């Protein structure tokens, strides 16, 4: 597509919210002291897969991109651009983290360093492809500016590994589910980027496998009561974040022929099944209270967003402070209720799935 440079807008920052993609850092020295010998062969095998670079020639724009997109209505276009923006930011965040891990671990952990370097290659490729797609709608992210001016959220290494493993796996299930749906219903493919999701999601899957292999090399991350609590927490945090985000943007999923709630339920179920191959415990999604509580959280979150979007007199603003506090209280209360729902031991869960 030929762009009008006068209309192309460059965005340097993204709005920071509780649910927005973030940039992470960690204790690199702690990771450099890991003993990965117990699972070295699996880690090395995955790095060998990364070296093959199966998608080296995959992310090449074809002639289908060479057109205008004025047929997409304004609301759908806005929601789609938001989808591209969030996806690009998340991929770029992964690129920065993996690149820094590769740099910091190069001397002491060369195999891990190479794995992270090759994953950063994939993430950069994804982010660049998404940013070019945004340019088709006259918007780009200034990734160079974001690199220099990013704000970090610090996570301990074990939290990085739990969260990123799940993020990569849920990314896989999101991409492959959208791809399979649009293969069956091509009339809903509003933009050609969706054709790339089948091979794209395999990068996400391999990245998740790499994190799983590292976690397995550190038994303390999977053994004991405390580890079970952390696995439960990150499963819930990742699932709730996706659910609340997608409920905000339901019109986008409807525009490609998906029911946003059913899409999220399916992705959560499949990610939960994937996590059962690694984690000692997973969530009991058959408990009807699980999605009931998530729906309540989504409702409270929507009300909070509506308050922030309204311009109101000072008196109403004061009242809204208390109302927002009440809604946050309900959100936290429901999250706590979700956290303390009974979980499923993974040995019994695997038998149930089979």
UniProtKB/Swiss-Prot annotation:
<dbReference type="GO" id="GO:0009507">
    <property type="term" value="C:chloroplast"/>
</dbReference>
<keyword id="KW-0150">Chloroplast</keyword>
<keyword id="KW-0408">Iron</keyword>
<dbReference type="GO" id="GO:0005506">
    <property type="term" value="F:iron ion binding"/>
</dbReference>
<keyword id="KW-0149">Chlorophyll biosynthesis</keyword>
<dbReference type="GO" id="GO:0015979">
    <property type="term" value="P:photosynthesis"/>
</dbReference>
<dbReference type="Pfam" id="PF02915">
    <property type="entry name" value="Rubrerythrin"/>
</dbReference>
<dbReference type="InterPro" id="IPR008434">
    <property type="entry name" value="AcsF"/>
</dbReference>
<comment type="pathway">
    <text>Porphyrin-containing compound metabolism; chlorophyll biosynthesis (light-independent).</text>
</comment>
<dbReference type="InterPro" id="IPR003251">
    <property type="entry name" value="Rr_diiron-bd_dom"/>
</dbReference>
<protein>
    <recommendedName>
        <fullName>Magnesium-protoporphyrin IX monomethyl ester [oxidative] cyclase</fullName>
        <ecNumber>1.14.13.81</ecNumber>
    </recommendedName>
</protein>
<comment type="similarity">
    <text>Belongs to the AcsF family.</text>
</comment>
<dbReference type="GO" id="GO:0048529">
    <property type="term" value="F:magnesium-protoporphyrin IX monomethyl ester (oxidative) cyclase activity"/>
</dbReference>
<dbReference type="GO" id="GO:0036068">
    <property type="term" value="P:light-independent chlorophyll biosynthetic process"/>
</dbReference>
<dbReference type="InterPro" id="IPR009078">
    <property type="entry name" value="Ferritin-like_SF"/>
</dbReference>
<keyword id="KW-0521">NADP</keyword>
<keyword id="KW-0934">Plastid</keyword>
<keyword id="KW-0479">Metal-binding</keyword>
<comment type="function">
    <text>Catalyzes the formation of the isocyclic ring in chlorophyll biosynthesis. Mediates the cyclase reaction, which results in the formation of divinylprotochlorophyllide (Pchlide) characteristic of all chlorophylls from magnesium-protoporphyrin IX 13-monomethyl ester (MgPMME).</text>
</comment>
<keyword id="KW-0602">Photosynthesis</keyword>
<keyword id="KW-0560">Oxidoreductase</keyword>
């Amino acid at each position: 597509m030929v762009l009008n440079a006068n209309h192309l807008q460059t965005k340097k920052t993204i709005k920071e919210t509780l649910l927005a993609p973030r940039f992470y850092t960690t204790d690199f020295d702690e990771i450099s002291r890991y003993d990965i010998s117990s699972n070295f062969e699996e880690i090395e095998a995955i790095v060998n897969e990364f070296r093959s670079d199966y998608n080296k020639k995959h992310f090449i724009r074809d002639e289908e991109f060479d057109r205008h997109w004025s047929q997409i209505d304004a609301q759908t276009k806005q929601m789609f651009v938001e989808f591209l923006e969030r996806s690009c930011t998340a991929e770029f965040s992964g690129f920065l983290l993996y690149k820094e891990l590769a740099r910091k671990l190069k001397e002491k952990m060369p195999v891990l360093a190479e794995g992270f370097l090759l994953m950063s290659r994939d993430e950069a490729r994804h982010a660049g492809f998404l940013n070019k797609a945004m340019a088709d709608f006259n918007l780009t992210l200034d990734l160079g500016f974001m690199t220099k001016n990013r704000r970090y959220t610090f996570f301990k290494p074990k939290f990085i590994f739990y969260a990123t493993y799940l993020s990569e796996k849920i990314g896989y299930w999101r991409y492959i589910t959208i791809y399979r749906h649009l293969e069956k219903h091509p009339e809903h493919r509003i933009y050609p980027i969706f054709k790339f999701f089948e091979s794209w999601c395999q990068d996400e899957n391999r990245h998740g496998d790499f994190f799983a292999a590292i976690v397995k090399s550190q038994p303390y991350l999977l053994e004991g009561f405390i580890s079970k609590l952390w696995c439960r927490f990150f499963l819930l945090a990742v699932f709730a974040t996706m659910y609340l985000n997608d409920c905000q943007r339901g019109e986008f999923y409807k525009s490609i022929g998906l029911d946003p709630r059913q899409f999220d339920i399916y992705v959560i179920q499949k990610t939960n099944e994937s996590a059962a191959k690694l984690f000692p415990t997973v969530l009991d999604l058959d408990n009807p209270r699980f999605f009931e509580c998530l729906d309540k959280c989504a409702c409270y979150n929507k009300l909070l967003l509506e308050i922030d979007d309204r311009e109101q007199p000072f008196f109403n603003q004061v009242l809204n402070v208390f109302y927002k506090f009440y809604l946050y209280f309900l959100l936290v209360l429901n999250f706590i209720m979700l956290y303390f729902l009974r979980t499923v031991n993974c040995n019994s869960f695997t038998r149930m799935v089979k």
